[in-house]
UniProtKB/Swiss-Prot annotation:
UniProt main location, coarse: secreted
Organism of this sequence: Bacillus licheniformis
Xref: SUPFAM superfamilies: N-acetylmuramoyl-L-alanine amidase-like (SSF55846), PGBD-like (SSF47090)
Compartment list: Secreted
Name of a matching Pfam family: Amidase_2
GO cellular component term of the entry, any: extracellular region
Entry similarity comment: Belongs to the N-acetylmuramoyl-L-alanine amidase 2 family.
Name of the molecule in the record: Probable N-acetylmuramoyl-L-alanine amidase
């Protein structure tokens, strides 16, 4: 069993507010995105620099190849999985910070999560599942909750989450139940409203209105409140685009996909301008409108220079926090992760913002 060290950070408004957790309904998996930092390094950061920088962020556990640092008590809130009121996992609503434990996996110097770290995380999470009576389908990614690209390897390959759940079930002596990557069943009425062909009413009409706004047209009948073939076709198109089961049935996983599509459609109304050239940490710091443009685009893609700080760290200065946000973005999209903004990073950002 992984060694768990209770090493709580001091109570403060930024990463350990001392608020009581409403319930433990799930476990949200993260990665630290700080190559080479150990679990203890992370704990010390959140007990010092994070507070000094007035950054709202934390998690309950940090796991590396050797141990797990328990830095926030389980019964308290940690700021790990809430982003501008987004929560796409129904059983964690309305705010995953108040309904879930956060587990961060440390990253090796080469940007990977070591097998021993994953093993330790599985042992920790299995113990937490046993303690709080959770099934493996209550283990989700940060990505599932807010659409943030975390943990990056598990976002690139959702099969890694499935493998992790199976590992946890094996440790608990259970058989794994097949579940979706987002840990929500399209046909489970307990997870939310289910809409399908043949149904009608206000819920259907609202869904149709949202589909049209998100770019999935209903040219013949529009939002008429009847779930017919045209609505099925629009839902299937949405599901295919999101990479989920395309059955034409609206349920929790389709709701998540629709919410993401709505956010994307809203972002398209904005014209994005990003600078040419190279931007990096220099002395004195590079600054000005061009840097603000880079920071604003990063924030729109959920890679905040300093989430929770004033304007989420958008200050017009290309410092270490902006470089770190760029590096996290680069890691997610397979670019050279050096924290330097250049032509390839610009092109990828613009492709995602369009």
């Amino acid at each position: 069993m992984v060694k768990v060290i209770n090493n709580f950070v001091k109570v403060n408004q930024y990463d350990r507010p001392g608020l009581k957790l409403a319930a433990v309904k799930g476990i949200v998996m993260h990665w630290t995105a700080t190559p080479g930092a150990s679990a203890l390094n992370e704990r010390n950061y959140f007990n010092g620099t994070c507070i000094a920088d007035k950054r709202y962020a934390s998690a309950h556990y940090f796991v590396d190849r050797h141990e797990a640092q328990h830095i926030i008590p389980d019964h308290e809130v940690a700021y790990h999985a809430h982003d501008q009121n987004r929560c796409y996992v129904s059983f964690l609503k309305p705010n995953a910070n108040t309904t879930a434990l956060g587990v961060e996996m440390c990253v090796e110097k080469d940007g990977t999560i070591h097998e021993e770290t994953i093993r330790n995380a599985a042992e920790l999470v299995a113990d937490l599942c046993k303690t709080y009576g959770l099934s493996a389908d209550r283990i989700v990614r940060h990505y599932d909750v807010t659409n943030k690209g975390c943990p990056t390897p598990w976002v690139r390959d959702a099969g890694q989450l499935s493998a992790f759940r199976k590992r946890v079930d094996s440790l608990l002596g259970r058989k794994t139940v097949s579940v979706s990557a987002a840990s929500t069943s399209q046909t489970s009425s307990s997870s939310g409203i289910i809409l399908k062909k043949g149904m009608s009413g206000s819920h259907v009409k609202k869904l149709q209105t949202r589909l049209v706004a998100a770019g999935f047209s209903l040219p013949k009948y529009g939002a008429d409140g009847s779930y017919g073939d045209e609505t099925v076709h629009a839902v299937v198109s949405l599901q295919k685009k999101a990479g989920i089961k395309a059955d034409g049935i609206y349920g929790p996983s389709t709701e998540k996909a629709l919410s993401a599509a709505e956010a994307s459609a809203a972002g398209k109304s904005k014209t994005w301008t990003l600078p040419d050239g190279i931007y990096k940490v220099k002395n004195p710091l590079m600054k000005g409108t061009a840097v603000t443009q880079i920071q604003t685009a990063l924030a729109a893609l959920y890679y905040y220079p300093d989430k929770g700080a004033k304007n989420n760290g958008i200050d017009g200065y290309y410092g270490m926090k902006t470089a770190n946000a760029v590096k996290r973005f680069q890691l997610m999209y397979g670019l050279g992760a050096d924290g330097i903004y250049g032509p390839k990073t610009k092109a990828k950002m613009l492709s995602l913002l369009k």
